[in-house]
Amino acid sequence: MKILVKIRLTRVGTHKKPFFRIVVMDAKAKANGAYIENLGHYDPVLGKVVLKKEAILAQLQNGAQPSETVKNILSQEGIWKEFIALKDANKKRKAALAKAK
């Protein structure tokens, strides 16, 4: 059975000082529950984003679904576009292998 995982934000900031971790967690887990892997953090006050690019791409290729907010952050950082390019390249490679057989 395949576990559905999501890439989403968990709030760890204090009152009126939001700060979020970008984490991979089970889709059915609570928003601030236990997570599988920490992929970076986001500070909306300063507009600062720190991401682990390779880990994010690996999780996306394994089928993790980003939340809308995380998808927007990944798009702004150029990671989502890179993931789509990798996905298309893999499709073309598989099609070429299937055609060769």
Swiss-Prot record:
InterPro entries: Ribosomal_bS16, Ribosomal_bS16_dom_sf. It comes from the Bacteria. The keyword Ribosomal protein applies. Pfam families: Ribosomal_S16 (PF00886). One of its GO terms (molecular function) is structural constituent of ribosome. The keyword Ribosomal protein applies. Keywords: Ribonucleoprotein, Ribosomal protein. Disulfide bonds: none annotated. GO terms for cellular component: cytoplasm; small ribosomal subunit. Belongs to the bacterial ribosomal protein bS16 family. The lineage of its organism: Bacteria, Bacillati, Mycoplasmatota, Mycoplasmoidales, Mycoplasmoidaceae. The gene is rpsP. This is Small ribosomal subunit protein bS16. One of its GO terms (biological process) is translation.
